[in-house]
């Protein structure tokens, strides 16, 4: 693709760290800087690194100083991205992993206007779900007409760590730290695999388990009530809340495992049985999301080169745009 893509990381938590590692492992990209609400914390964490770190609120300053081709937005979906996304898309092209499924249409519209008005490209809501799983749902429903794709998450006994839901809990007043694990219901998976497109509610497909560390003065009952009634995140599900110490959280829940599957069962036009199933398992959820984000950064630049502007999702992007291989190489290696 010629010159290396210059990428700024906006927000430096677990996903931001994963994005940094993924950029450094990509031969066609370079990290030009990190922007954060707390640049001093990031500088301290990076130590003697020569990576430039600037205040995310000084948009004119860091876009001028860092000269990024695009920014990968690594903030949370509950409060960060709804505000930061449109604001930043008005200044440069962006990629993000906004994962509040119910709000994606509204977020898309806001990002589309901001990016289109400024001639930028904003790729939104990518990762593995939303993202890869979104694409798998469309493929399954297209290849097996009339089928209903189902998504299941947290297939292991310990469940899968949800970063977005954990972040949403941490934003509740009185919460010091938290982890949220999603568990798939095995009976629901069995029903889907048997065919017939069963009608299943969200609560019949998954349940949620929370491990929360409270501030000293926090009201445990109020926090639990807030969690269980949080729209989109917890309200539709059976949710178990556990209050533990910070030491226990650090020892027992320090990793970031997750995984899931998309299953679609039905019939072909001649009545033959048909089933499509896609599964992924990640040792680190943030590293997985970061890897997908970085591939979409490559696609963003190709869309920009094509003269495109506005918001896009994984559903709008040719798969070849994610790869750093040429068309000839892709045909030879993967076709």
Language-model region placement:
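Rossmann-fold NAD(P)-binding glycine/threonine-rich loop
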Residues: 98-122
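Rossmann-fold NAD(P) dinucleotide-binding segment
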Residues: 59-74, 78-97
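Hydrophobic Val/Ile/Leu positions in short beta-strands of Rossmann-like dinucleotide-binding domains
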Residues: 7-9, 73
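Glycine-rich Rossmann-fold phosphate-binding loop(s) that bind the pyrophosphate
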Residues: 12
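NAD(P)-dependent Rossmann-like dehydrogenase/reductase catalytic/cofactor-binding core
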Residues: 270, 274-335
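C-terminal substrate-binding/catalytic lobe of Rossmann-fold NAD(P)-dependent oxidoreductases
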Residues: 6, 17-18, 25-31, 36-41, ...
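Short alpha-helices
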Residues: 116-144, 292-293
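Oxidoreductase and adenylate-handling cofactor-binding alpha/beta cores
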Residues: 132-149, 167-181, 299
């Amino acid at each position: 693709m010629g010159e290396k893509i210059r990428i700024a990381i906006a927000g430096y938590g677990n996903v931001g760290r994963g994005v940094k590692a993924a950029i450094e492992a990509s031969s066609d990209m370079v990290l030009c800087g990190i922007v954060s609400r707390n640049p001093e914390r990031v500088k301290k964490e990076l130590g003697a690194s020569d990576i430039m770190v600037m205040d995310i609120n000084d948009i004119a300053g860091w876009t001028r100083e860092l000269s990024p081709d695009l920014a990968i937005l690594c903030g949370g979906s509950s409060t960060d991205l709804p505000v930061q996304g449109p604001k930043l898309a008005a200044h440069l092209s962006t990629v993000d992993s906004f994962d509040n499924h119910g709000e994606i249409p509204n977020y898309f519209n806001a990002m589309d206007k901001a990016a289109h008005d400024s001639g930028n490209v904003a790729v939104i809501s990518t990762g593995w779900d939303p993202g890869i799983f979104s694409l798998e749902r469309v493929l399954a429903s297209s290849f097996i007409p009339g089928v209903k794709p189902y998504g299941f998450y947290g297939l292991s006994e310990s469940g899968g760590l949800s970063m977005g839901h954990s972040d949403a809990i941490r934003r509740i007043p009185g919460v010091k730290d938290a982890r949220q694990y999603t568990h798939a219901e095995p009976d629901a998976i069995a029903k889907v695999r048997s065919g017939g497109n069963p009608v299943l509610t969200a609560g019949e497909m998954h349940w949620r388990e929370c491990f929360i560390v409270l501030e000293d003065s926090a009201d445990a009952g109020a926090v639990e009530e807030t969690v269980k009634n949080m729209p989109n995140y917890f309200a539709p599900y059976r949710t178990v809340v556990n209050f533990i110490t910070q030491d226990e959280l650090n020892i027992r829940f320090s990793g970031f495992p997750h995984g899931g599957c998309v299953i679609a069962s039905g019939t072909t036009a001649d009545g033959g049985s048909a089933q499509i199933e896609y599964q992924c398992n990640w040792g680190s959820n943030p590293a997985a999301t970061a890897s997908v984000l970085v591939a979409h950064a490559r696609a963003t630049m190709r869309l920009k080169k094509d003269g495109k502007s506005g918001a896009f999702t994984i559903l709008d992007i040719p798969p070849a745009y994610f790869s750093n291989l040429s068309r000839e190489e892709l045909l030879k290696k993967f076709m």
